[in-house]
């Protein structure tokens, strides 16, 4: 997928990118590839793959959650890595207010430089573990309209990291690959324990490669119990599962 095909593929979903936005994506690609030579940000570095599997893929939540397109939502991106999905969403929909949390300082430094070079405003970054960022004494707890995560962990783990950040009436959006149906079944208990309810599981395929993808949308129905998230590392080692 080259930049023109990227533009056309999004236009099919009624997302129209301006020349400025396309230039921002082009610069994003250059900065990503250049920095990746210094330390590992991604294994995907060829332009067609970056545009498809990073940029296009990051924008797919807007296909199924229309409010992302025109509402000034506050979004927390948990474990954003090289900025996915939040930076592509911010480029395409500038009204979004983005907060990024990542545990590796090198990635945060890259993101700070990226935001400056792209001329983006309304983006904050935090070097922190998701477990402490969403802790019971954190000012960020239950303060965001949306929490997003892409390929960070299984849904049973992700929900413990993300749902405590989402305000009542807000949503968690998980971007998943082929095994999402199994994850959804396994993760339902954790989602419910954390005050959420799975309301959408949208299955689709990426253009060109037909790689399977899922967008899972979870509504925040009630407060997350203060005992969650547990201490750093525990959610991954001991995911919340239904008692046998």
UniProtKB/Swiss-Prot annotation:
Residue segments, region Disordered: 221-244
Keywords noted in UniProt: Cytoplasm, Methyltransferase, rRNA processing, S-adenosyl-L-methionine, Transferase
Pfam families: GidB (PF02527)
Gene Ontology cellular component annotations, sorted alphabetically: cytosol
GO-annotated molecular function: rRNA (guanine-N7-)-methyltransferase activity
Record CDD domains: AdoMet_MTases
EC id: 2.1.1.-
Statement: the UniProt record of this protein carries the keyword Lipoprotein: no
Location within or outside the cell: Cytoplasm
Residues involved in S-adenosyl-L-methionine binding: 79, 84, 130-131, 150
Keyword Glycoprotein among record annotations: no
InterPro entries on file: rRNA_ssu_MeTfrase_G (IPR003682), SAM-dependent_MTases_sf (IPR029063)
Protein family according to the UniProt entry: Belongs to the methyltransferase superfamily. RNA methyltransferase RsmG family.
Job of this protein: Specifically methylates the N7 position of a guanine in 16S rRNA.
UniProt name for this protein: Ribosomal RNA small subunit methyltransferase G
Species the sequence originates in: Lactiplantibacillus plantarum (strain ATCC BAA-793 / NCIMB 8826 / WCFS1)
Classification lineage: Bacteria, Bacillati, Bacillota, Bacilli, Lactobacillales
Gene that produces this protein: rsmG
